[in-house]
Amino acid sequence: MASLLMLLTSVAMTAQESNWTLMPKAGMTVSTLAGEDAEYCSNAIGWTAGVDLGRRLSERVELTVGVGFTKNVVKDDIGTSIVSIRVFDEGRMTFEYIDVPIGVNVKLWQGLSASLDVQPSLMTAGKERFFYDEYACDSFEDRVKFMSNPYSDPRTSEYTHFLKRDSEDGGGIRHMSNKLNVSASIGLSYEYRRVTLGARYHFGLTNVMDTDKLPMYSHYPDQSEYDGRHKDKLRYLSLTLGYRIGL
């Protein structure tokens, strides 16, 4: 009995003194693109989830490596484009990645820590959706009259009326994107009773798009020529809630 008690005490002390931790976490992202197309893009909300393995080196310093999934959404402000009886005014690009963040956490004060990470990410999916207002004509004759004028605007034409708000898949984003994206991040976190609230800002180091696969077309509000050389990088803020488990 005494031997069993000593064994249990030894295991408990080892667990308490372990320098290894595991932290599952999940939260939201606020993303945009930085680069030549930044003026046409704005923030949109996505989500992220994953788990970090930590190894404490000292009282203040901890090395971490993790694996996670991030869905970044970017709003594409395409301006107003009239196609027949549809008025396109917004697009949303979605980039989904499996992330492997590698970094260091430094304890600043009590539960407050700062972090610095490098994160390679493998793209798993990508898509683009365009949103539009659709209008309709009451009769075939009205449609002929509306279509006879190439400058007709369905929002003001006497031959049309508003029908619905809808969207369609733009396609091609995954094919035109780099499969590997590398970013760096800086952040702050606060831990209380193993519950950790974290905020990180991620700076893309590589281009989101593969410039060799971009088409030659113009679809921006100023109708500037799209030369296929745009070099945009992903920038996003992640806010997560995690729980630290001692190993």
Model-derived regions: residue spans:
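Short glycine/proline- and aromatic-enriched beta-strand/turn motifs that initiate or cap beta-hairpins
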Residues: 16-56, 63, 246
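Outer-membrane beta-barrel channels and translocator barrels
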Residues: 17, 56-60, 109, 192-195, ...
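Extracellular/periplasm-exposed beta-strand and loop segments of Gram-negative cell-envelope proteins
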Residues: 32-44, 72-96, 123-183, 206-236
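Transmembrane beta-barrel domains of outer membrane proteins
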Residues: 52-54, 103-105, 187-191, 242-244
